[in-house]
Amino acid sequence: MDKRPIGVMDSGLGGLSVIRVLREQLPQESVIFVGDQGHFPYGTKTKEQIQQLALRIGKFLLEQDVKMMIIACNTATAAALRLLQNELPIPVIGVIKPGAMAATQHHYKKIGVIGTESTIKNGAYAKTLAKLNPDLSVISSPAQPLVSIVEHGQTGTSEAQKAVDTELEVFDNQSIEALILGCTHFPFLQKEIHNKLGSNVQLIDPAFETIRQAKELLTGKNQLSDNLASSINLYSTGDAKDLVAGAQQWLPNGYSKCAHIELNEEG
Protein backbone atom coordinates (compact mmCIF):
# COMPACT_ATOMS: atom_id res chain seq x y z
CA MET A 1 0.00 0.00 0.00
CA ASP A 2 1.14 3.54 -0.75
CA LYS A 3 -0.70 6.57 0.63
CA ARG A 4 1.28 9.09 -1.41
CA PRO A 5 -0.96 11.21 -3.65
CA ILE A 6 -1.46 10.99 -7.40
CA GLY A 7 -0.38 14.13 -9.26
CA VAL A 8 -2.62 15.47 -12.02
CA MET A 9 -2.03 18.42 -14.36
CA ASP A 10 -3.95 20.33 -17.01
CA SER A 11 -3.83 23.70 -18.73
CA GLY A 12 -6.95 24.73 -16.81
CA LEU A 13 -10.23 23.33 -15.53
CA GLY A 14 -10.42 20.36 -17.91
CA GLY A 15 -8.40 18.13 -15.61
CA LEU A 16 -11.29 18.22 -13.15
CA SER A 17 -13.15 15.87 -15.51
CA VAL A 18 -10.37 13.33 -15.01
CA ILE A 19 -10.28 13.88 -11.24
CA ARG A 20 -14.03 13.29 -11.15
CA VAL A 21 -13.56 9.85 -12.71
CA LEU A 22 -10.51 9.15 -10.55
CA ARG A 23 -12.57 9.81 -7.42
CA GLU A 24 -15.34 7.52 -8.67
CA GLN A 25 -12.97 4.66 -9.48
CA LEU A 26 -10.28 5.16 -6.81
CA PRO A 27 -11.93 7.00 -3.88
CA GLN A 28 -9.15 6.19 -1.43
CA GLU A 29 -6.47 7.92 -3.52
CA SER A 30 -5.40 11.44 -2.59
CA VAL A 31 -4.89 13.89 -5.45
CA ILE A 32 -2.74 16.96 -6.03
CA PHE A 33 -3.93 18.89 -9.07
CA VAL A 34 -2.22 21.75 -10.89
CA GLY A 35 -4.34 23.78 -13.29
CA ASP A 36 -1.94 25.94 -15.29
CA GLN A 37 -4.46 28.73 -15.81
CA GLY A 38 -1.70 31.32 -15.69
CA HIS A 39 -0.54 30.00 -19.08
CA PHE A 40 -3.95 29.03 -20.53
CA PRO A 41 -4.57 28.02 -23.30
CA TYR A 42 -2.05 25.33 -24.26
CA GLY A 43 -3.79 24.57 -27.56
CA THR A 44 -2.23 27.53 -29.37
CA LYS A 45 1.29 27.19 -27.92
CA THR A 46 4.35 25.57 -29.51
CA LYS A 47 5.49 22.07 -28.57
CA GLU A 48 8.57 23.52 -26.86
CA GLN A 49 6.52 25.95 -24.77
CA ILE A 50 4.18 23.18 -23.64
CA GLN A 51 7.10 20.90 -22.78
CA GLN A 52 8.68 23.60 -20.61
CA LEU A 53 5.43 24.28 -18.77
CA ALA A 54 4.62 20.59 -18.26
CA LEU A 55 8.11 19.84 -16.97
CA ARG A 56 7.85 22.66 -14.42
CA ILE A 57 4.57 21.24 -13.18
CA GLY A 58 6.02 17.72 -13.11
CA LYS A 59 8.90 18.90 -10.92
CA PHE A 60 6.49 20.70 -8.59
CA LEU A 61 4.39 17.54 -8.24
CA LEU A 62 7.54 15.53 -7.57
CA GLU A 63 8.33 17.93 -4.71
CA GLN A 64 4.88 17.09 -3.30
CA ASP A 65 5.96 13.42 -3.21
CA VAL A 66 3.42 12.08 -5.70
CA LYS A 67 3.68 8.40 -6.68
CA MET A 68 2.34 8.87 -10.22
CA MET A 69 1.57 11.71 -12.61
CA ILE A 70 -1.43 11.87 -14.93
CA ILE A 71 -1.26 14.42 -17.74
CA ALA A 72 -4.98 15.22 -17.83
CA CYS A 73 -4.53 17.31 -20.96
CA ASN A 74 -4.50 15.97 -24.51
CA THR A 75 -2.37 18.85 -25.81
CA ALA A 76 0.28 18.34 -23.13
CA THR A 77 0.13 14.56 -23.58
CA ALA A 78 0.91 14.93 -27.29
CA ALA A 79 3.72 17.41 -26.69
CA ALA A 80 5.34 16.30 -23.46
CA LEU A 81 4.43 12.74 -22.39
CA ARG A 82 7.64 11.15 -23.61
CA LEU A 83 9.75 13.97 -22.16
CA LEU A 84 8.17 13.67 -18.72
CA GLN A 85 8.47 9.89 -18.77
CA ASN A 86 12.19 10.30 -19.43
CA GLU A 87 12.77 13.13 -16.94
CA LEU A 88 10.71 12.09 -13.92
CA PRO A 89 11.46 9.06 -11.68
CA ILE A 90 7.77 8.14 -11.35
CA PRO A 91 5.23 6.63 -13.76
CA VAL A 92 3.67 9.25 -16.06
CA ILE A 93 0.58 8.49 -18.15
CA GLY A 94 -1.37 10.60 -20.61
CA VAL A 95 -4.88 10.53 -22.03
CA ILE A 96 -4.43 10.05 -25.79
CA LYS A 97 -3.56 6.36 -26.05
CA PRO A 98 -6.24 5.42 -23.49
CA GLY A 99 -8.77 7.48 -25.46
CA ALA A 100 -7.81 5.77 -28.70
CA MET A 101 -7.92 2.35 -27.04
CA ALA A 102 -11.40 3.06 -25.68
CA ALA A 103 -12.57 3.91 -29.21
CA THR A 104 -11.07 0.82 -30.83
CA GLN A 105 -12.51 -1.58 -28.23
CA HIS A 106 -15.80 -1.17 -30.11
CA HIS A 107 -16.31 -2.15 -33.73
CA TYR A 108 -16.82 1.34 -35.06
CA LYS A 109 -16.14 1.97 -38.73
CA LYS A 110 -16.24 5.76 -38.67
CA ILE A 111 -15.55 8.10 -35.77
CA GLY A 112 -14.83 11.76 -35.13
CA VAL A 113 -12.23 13.42 -32.94
CA ILE A 114 -12.36 16.95 -31.54
CA GLY A 115 -9.53 18.64 -29.66
CA THR A 116 -7.45 21.78 -29.43
CA GLU A 117 -5.70 23.23 -32.46
CA SER A 118 -2.41 21.70 -31.30
CA THR A 119 -3.78 18.20 -30.63
CA ILE A 120 -5.51 18.00 -34.00
CA LYS A 121 -2.68 19.65 -35.94
CA ASN A 122 -0.07 17.14 -34.78
CA GLY A 123 -2.38 14.23 -35.55
CA ALA A 124 -1.91 12.61 -32.16
CA TYR A 125 -5.21 10.74 -32.21
CA ALA A 126 -5.22 9.95 -35.93
CA LYS A 127 -1.76 8.35 -35.68
CA THR A 128 -2.60 6.34 -32.56
CA LEU A 129 -5.93 5.17 -33.95
CA ALA A 130 -4.29 4.14 -37.24
CA LYS A 131 -1.86 1.91 -35.33
CA LEU A 132 -4.64 0.29 -33.32
CA ASN A 133 -7.11 -0.10 -36.21
CA PRO A 134 -5.86 0.79 -39.73
CA ASP A 135 -9.35 0.25 -41.19
CA LEU A 136 -11.04 2.84 -38.98
CA SER A 137 -12.18 6.00 -40.76
CA VAL A 138 -11.36 9.07 -38.65
CA ILE A 139 -12.51 12.66 -39.09
CA SER A 140 -10.51 15.05 -36.90
CA SER A 141 -11.50 18.65 -36.29
CA PRO A 142 -10.20 21.36 -33.94
CA ALA A 143 -12.72 22.90 -31.56
CA GLN A 144 -10.51 25.40 -29.72
CA PRO A 145 -13.31 27.88 -28.83
CA LEU A 146 -15.07 25.23 -26.75
CA VAL A 147 -12.15 25.18 -24.31
CA SER A 148 -12.77 28.81 -23.39
CA ILE A 149 -16.51 28.17 -23.00
CA VAL A 150 -15.73 25.69 -20.22
CA GLU A 151 -12.92 27.76 -18.73
CA HIS A 152 -15.21 30.79 -18.44
CA GLY A 153 -18.01 28.85 -16.75
CA GLN A 154 -20.44 29.10 -19.67
CA THR A 155 -21.54 25.44 -19.88
CA GLY A 156 -25.30 25.00 -19.99
CA THR A 157 -25.86 28.36 -21.69
CA SER A 158 -27.22 29.26 -25.11
CA GLU A 159 -23.75 30.60 -25.95
CA ALA A 160 -22.30 27.16 -25.26
CA GLN A 161 -24.85 25.47 -27.51
CA LYS A 162 -24.21 27.96 -30.32
CA ALA A 163 -20.45 27.39 -30.07
CA VAL A 164 -20.87 23.60 -30.10
CA ASP A 165 -23.24 23.79 -33.07
CA THR A 166 -20.70 25.86 -35.01
CA GLU A 167 -17.60 23.85 -34.12
CA LEU A 168 -19.24 20.48 -34.84
CA GLU A 169 -20.79 21.46 -38.18
CA VAL A 170 -17.98 19.53 -39.84
CA PHE A 171 -19.68 16.29 -38.74
CA ASP A 172 -23.02 17.10 -40.38
CA ASN A 173 -24.06 14.27 -42.74
CA GLN A 174 -20.86 12.33 -41.96
CA SER A 175 -22.64 9.46 -40.16
CA ILE A 176 -20.00 9.09 -37.46
CA GLU A 177 -20.77 6.40 -34.88
CA ALA A 178 -18.72 7.88 -32.06
CA LEU A 179 -16.84 11.04 -31.11
CA ILE A 180 -13.66 11.11 -29.05
CA LEU A 181 -13.67 14.07 -26.68
CA GLY A 182 -10.00 14.82 -27.31
CA CYS A 183 -9.73 17.62 -24.76
CA THR A 184 -10.45 17.14 -21.07
CA HIS A 185 -12.61 20.28 -21.05
CA PHE A 186 -15.11 18.72 -23.46
CA PRO A 187 -16.83 16.19 -21.12
CA PHE A 188 -18.38 19.22 -19.42
CA LEU A 189 -20.16 19.95 -22.73
CA GLN A 190 -21.64 16.48 -23.28
CA LYS A 191 -25.23 17.75 -23.12
CA GLU A 192 -24.61 20.37 -25.81
CA ILE A 193 -22.68 17.88 -27.97
CA HIS A 194 -25.50 15.32 -27.73
CA ASN A 195 -27.97 18.05 -28.67
CA LYS A 196 -25.95 18.71 -31.83
CA LEU A 197 -25.00 15.18 -32.90
CA GLY A 198 -27.93 13.18 -31.53
CA SER A 199 -27.94 10.54 -28.81
CA ASN A 200 -27.06 7.76 -31.27
CA VAL A 201 -23.47 9.07 -31.53
CA GLN A 202 -21.43 7.63 -28.66
CA LEU A 203 -19.24 10.14 -26.81
CA ILE A 204 -15.90 8.71 -25.69
CA ASP A 205 -14.35 10.31 -22.61
CA PRO A 206 -10.71 9.12 -22.41
CA ALA A 207 -10.71 9.66 -18.64
CA PHE A 208 -12.35 6.30 -17.92
CA GLU A 209 -9.72 4.21 -19.73
CA THR A 210 -6.96 6.47 -18.38
CA ILE A 211 -7.99 5.85 -14.78
CA ARG A 212 -8.47 2.13 -15.47
CA GLN A 213 -4.87 1.99 -16.69
CA ALA A 214 -3.68 4.03 -13.70
CA LYS A 215 -5.39 1.58 -11.34
CA GLU A 216 -3.86 -1.37 -13.18
CA LEU A 217 -0.39 0.17 -12.96
CA LEU A 218 -0.68 0.98 -9.26
CA THR A 219 -2.10 -2.48 -8.52
CA GLY A 220 0.85 -4.11 -10.28
CA LYS A 221 3.30 -2.08 -8.17
CA ASN A 222 1.29 -2.66 -4.96
CA GLN A 223 0.89 1.11 -4.67
CA LEU A 224 -2.88 1.47 -4.27
CA SER A 225 -3.89 3.48 -1.21
CA ASP A 226 -6.15 2.29 1.61
CA ASN A 227 -6.54 5.82 2.95
CA LEU A 228 -10.07 6.37 4.27
CA ALA A 229 -9.35 10.09 4.67
CA SER A 230 -8.07 10.86 1.17
CA SER A 231 -7.79 14.48 0.05
CA ILE A 232 -7.94 16.62 -3.09
CA ASN A 233 -5.58 19.59 -3.06
CA LEU A 234 -5.98 22.00 -5.97
CA TYR A 235 -3.42 24.53 -7.20
CA SER A 236 -3.76 27.18 -9.89
CA THR A 237 -1.02 29.22 -11.54
CA GLY A 238 -3.74 31.76 -12.34
CA ASP A 239 -6.67 33.04 -10.30
CA ALA A 240 -7.55 30.39 -7.73
CA LYS A 241 -11.14 31.72 -7.64
CA ASP A 242 -11.72 30.32 -11.15
CA LEU A 243 -10.50 26.89 -10.06
CA VAL A 244 -12.67 27.04 -6.93
CA ALA A 245 -15.73 27.83 -9.06
CA GLY A 246 -15.00 24.90 -11.38
CA ALA A 247 -14.36 22.51 -8.50
CA GLN A 248 -17.57 23.51 -6.75
CA GLN A 249 -19.50 22.81 -9.94
CA TRP A 250 -17.81 19.62 -11.13
CA LEU A 251 -16.40 17.80 -8.09
CA PRO A 252 -19.56 16.54 -6.36
CA ASN A 253 -17.74 15.31 -3.27
CA GLY A 254 -15.80 18.53 -2.79
CA TYR A 255 -12.11 19.17 -2.32
CA SER A 256 -9.72 19.81 0.57
CA LYS A 257 -8.08 23.10 -0.40
CA CYS A 258 -7.36 25.38 -3.33
CA ALA A 259 -4.47 27.83 -3.60
CA HIS A 260 -2.48 29.90 -6.08
CA ILE A 261 1.10 28.86 -6.85
CA GLU A 262 3.94 30.43 -8.78
CA LEU A 263 6.15 28.05 -10.75
CA ASN A 264 9.56 29.49 -11.51
CA GLU A 265 11.79 28.60 -14.44
CA GLU A 266 13.48 25.83 -12.48
CA GLY A 267 10.14 24.31 -11.41
Swiss-Prot record:
It is an enzyme of class 5 (isomerase). PROSITE patterns: ASP_GLU_RACEMASE_1 (PS00923), ASP_GLU_RACEMASE_2 (PS00924). It catalyses: L-glutamate = D-glutamate. Pathway: Cell wall biogenesis; peptidoglycan biosynthesis. GO terms for biological process: cell wall organization; peptidoglycan biosynthetic process; regulation of cell shape. The active site is at C73 (proton donor/acceptor), C183 (proton donor/acceptor). GO terms for molecular function: glutamate racemase activity. Keywords: Cell shape, Cell wall biogenesis/degradation, Isomerase, Peptidoglycan synthesis. Its EC number is 5.1.1.3. The keyword Lyase does not apply. Belongs to the aspartate/glutamate racemases family. HAMAP family: Glu_racemase (MF_00258). Provides the (R)-glutamate required for cell wall biosynthesis. NCBIfam families: glut_race. This is Glutamate racemase. It comes from Limosilactobacillus reuteri (strain DSM 20016).
